[in-house]
């Protein structure tokens, strides 16, 4: 507990906010180019082949981004839009690729939560 005199001399230090997605530099999304597209296995209780991409953003930083949805058309040199948001069972994956934007096509035959996966409304 500081004294009044210490507060007058130094004041209170503001609490520094640490960004959850520092590579985006405060932007909601950022464009990038896929460097590697591969699959990885998740942490302990889960088992799958999760699709991820290593993306070089326009600011020069390289991040690992998750590719959501079933099936994708991404390959090396694909231009993608990246947003923040981690994948809990993949350590080090703190970004997601936005489906239906730039080179990332929307998920085919998607009926529910379509806007999240860039899918058009199906014909009756």
Curated annotation (Swiss-Prot):
Lineage: Bacteria, Bacillati, Bacillota, Clostridia, Thermoanaerobacterales
GO biological process terms, semicolon-separated: translation
GO cellular component, one term: small ribosomal subunit
GO MF entries: rRNA binding; structural constituent of ribosome; tRNA binding
UniProt entry keywords in alphabetical sequence: Methylation, Ribonucleoprotein, Ribosomal protein, RNA-binding, rRNA-binding, tRNA-binding
Family: Belongs to the universal ribosomal protein uS12 family.
Entries under Pfam families matching the protein: Ribosom_S12_S23
InterPro entries: NA-bd_OB-fold, Ribosomal_uS12, Ribosomal_uS12_bac
Subunit annotation: Part of the 30S ribosomal subunit. Contacts proteins S8 and S17. May interact with IF1 in the 30S initiation complex.
Alphabetized HAMAP family for the sequence: Ribosomal_uS12_B
Gene that specifies this protein: rpsL
NCBIfam families the record matches: rpsL_bact (TIGR00981)
Protein name: Small ribosomal subunit protein uS12
In-chain residues carrying the UniProt-annotated modification 3-methylthioaspartic acid: 89
Function: With S4 and S5 plays an important role in translational accuracy. Interacts with and stabilizes bases of the 16S rRNA that are involved in tRNA selection in the A site and with the mRNA backbone. Located at the interface of the 30S and 50S subunits, it traverses the body of the 30S subunit contacting proteins on the other side and probably holding the rRNA structure together. The combined cluster of proteins S8, S12 and S17 appears to hold together the shoulder and platform of the 30S subunit.
Domain of life according to the entry: Bacteria
């Amino acid at each position: 507990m500081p004294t009044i005199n210490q507060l007058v001399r130094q004041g209170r230090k503001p609490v520094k906010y640490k960004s959850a997605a520092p590579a985006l530099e405060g932007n909601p999304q950022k464009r990038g180019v896929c460097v590697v597209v591969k699959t990885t296995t998740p942490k302990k209780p889960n088992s799958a082949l999760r699709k991820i991409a290593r993306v070089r953003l326009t600011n020069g930083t390289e991040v690992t981004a998750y590719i959501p949805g079933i099936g994708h058309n991404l390959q090396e040199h694909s231009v993608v839009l990246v947003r923040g948001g981690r994948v809990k069972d993949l350590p080090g994956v703190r970004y997601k690729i936005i489906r239906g934007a730039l080179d990332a096509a929307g998920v085919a035959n998607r009926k529910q939560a379509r806007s999240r996966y860039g899918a058009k409304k199906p014909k009756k």
